[in-house]
Amino acid sequence: KRLKAVAVQGDMEVPTAVGPELMKALRKKHVGALSGHWRQLHETGTPGIYDMCCSMDDAPTKNYKGVAEFDSPNYADCRGEIVLEKQKRRYGCWRCPIACGGIMKAGNGDYVYDEGAHKPEYETMAMFGSNLCNDNLESLIVVSDLCNRLGVDTISAGASMAFLMECFEHGILTAADNDGLEMKWGDHRAIV
């Protein structure tokens, strides 16, 4: 009952319920699925759907009370193609046939950061981007990297930040309650 781990080593083949012919057919089918829509996801990763979701009002905006077209009109500044311009190299997660991950180049614009940050995923971009009316891509890369390194879930953190901004918007909280920091929609410096 207090088993902590099991380590197995060897070179015996592990039998499967399906034969090698079926495995080859399944592999071919899954690799073929990478064409078309899957190819787009492979190329850009989940940031490739960010601007589409914003344009269709499917991405959260202003704590789910706004519309990206009006409240975050420059959301296209964070579209997948622009994210790729800041990407150094690609990688794939283990056993994932899409392999959409990316390692970012060093940042030298509004935010200076070291090379090696992971490409932000759609959920991070939506929760810290359109949800907070933030169209600064480098801030999204920095926030994504900070959350990853600290073990913080970006969806929950972005939602909490939106609630905080809404409290400021309605006068429930002020800068005096927040160590002098004013929180306004779209203020990427306050977000970071």
Protein language model features and the residues they cover:
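Intrinsically disordered, low-complexity segments enriched in small residues
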Residues: 1-192
